[in-house]
Amino acid sequence: MRRLLFIICVFFLSVTAVMAQKEKVKNQPYADLKWFHLGFHVGLHAQDLILTNTGVATNGETWYAEIPSYSPGFSVGVIGDMYLNPYFNLRFTPTIHFGDKKFVFRRPEMEGVEGTDENPVVSMYSTSVRSNYLTFPLDVKYSAFRVNNYRPYLIGGIYGAFDLGRKKGNPILLKGTDFGVEFGIGCDIYLPFFKLCPELKFSFGLVDLLEKDRSDLTDLELIKYPNSLSKATSRMVTLTFNFA
């Protein structure tokens, strides 16, 4: 992730250097001087969890969980942007993220072992958890000097999140609320009638989301899967296109 951020920073610095070579007519020259303005954004995201396995056996079985791949989800929200000074803005962006996560549980010691019809060997189990997050990020935006019709920026802050897609009875149940920090990078592109702002953001949850009380599980065979985990914290990568 550090390498990715370095590449992004180098890219924006290179673009700024190239654009600075020739002055152009500026679209919306006073757009950034508004005390407050509204907008909206749409984009894609990938949800993930940092999982901590217990390594503890349940009924003689030791399972290890992972999220092997990411499924892209859809994000949409509104933007409220308040002017602080020529370089800093305060931004509030309520957003809803529609997505899911696929868990894969494995028993390494049983992989490759063949069972019988009477005693089948189960070495892998998979399940999906749908998470529709309603997030409320509060960020500070630092914008570089505007060059022609482009202005790169950095953004960072905190967020609260509520999971609207929780469903009891699933082997993995996540808590309904989360809190974390986020940071990102973007660029304001000044068009004749509005600003288009591609933005890449990274979010890291600070709350253990794993629900440990699983009295809702009616199938006792499933309890070994949540018992194989001790902690789960969220993280998300979001690519949005802001219109303001």
Predicted segments, located by residue:
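Glycine- and aromatic-enriched membrane insertion/assembly motifs of diderm outer-membrane
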Residues: A57-E114
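Short glycine/proline- and aromatic-enriched beta-strand/turn motifs that initiate or cap beta-hairpins
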Residues: A20-G73, M236, N242-A244
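Repeated loop/turn-to-beta-strand initiation elements of outer-membrane beta-barrel proteins
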Residues: D48, F88-L90, N148, F193-L196
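Transmembrane beta-strands of outer-membrane beta-barrel pores
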Residues: L44-D48, I96-D100, A144, I158-L164, ...
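Outer-membrane beta-barrel strand-turn architecture
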Residues: D32, M82-P86, A144-N148, I189-P192, ...
